[in-house]
Regions:
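Conserved non-transmembrane functional hotspots
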Residues: 1-139
Length: 139
């Protein structure tokens, strides 16, 4: 009887872990989709900024503190860029580079939180990734 109870407990824990993993992947993907939409046209609007608070709140429910902090940095940078002017703001190239860098840090924290790897992506690889993305966006 004890073994059966233990097996049931393990199966339930496994299902819970699987569901949590799926939820985390979904919220991380949603955040990347929102940020991608913002950066694709090179402009930020109030409507775009307003899409971020609820994913941040959901992160607090699901993600590690490191993930939350990393995304807050992205959000803070987007707010800083948007705060410069009026209703629709053009994102300067230097601001895009910083946003991409922060998104790369966020991505790395997501990777660790999902236990894809307990080793962070090499900082040099992150730097090259940001450089490649920045170069591609200038064309």
């Amino acid at each position: 009887m004890f073994l059966l109870n233990k097996q049931t407990e393990i199966e339930q824990e496994s299902k819970k872990s699987e569901r949590l993993f799926d939820e985390k992947v979904n919220i991380y993907q949603k955040i990347f989709d929102i940020c991608s939409d913002m950066l694709m046209d090179g402009k930020l609007s109030q409507d775009e900024i307003n899409r971020l608070p609820f994913p941040l709140i959901k992160l607090q429910m699901l993600a590690s503190e490191d993930v939350i902090i990393a995304f807050q940095e992205v959000f803070n940078e987007l707010n800083r860029v948007y705060d410069v002017e009026g209703e629709v703001v053009t994102i300067q190239d230097s601001d895009k580079v910083e946003i991409y860098r922060l998104l790369s840090v966020f991505s790395n924290e997501c990777r660790k939180d999902l236990e894809i790897s307990d080793v962070p992506v090499d900082p040099e690889i992150q730097k090259m990734t940001v450089s490649t993305i920045s170069s591609a966006n200038k064309k």
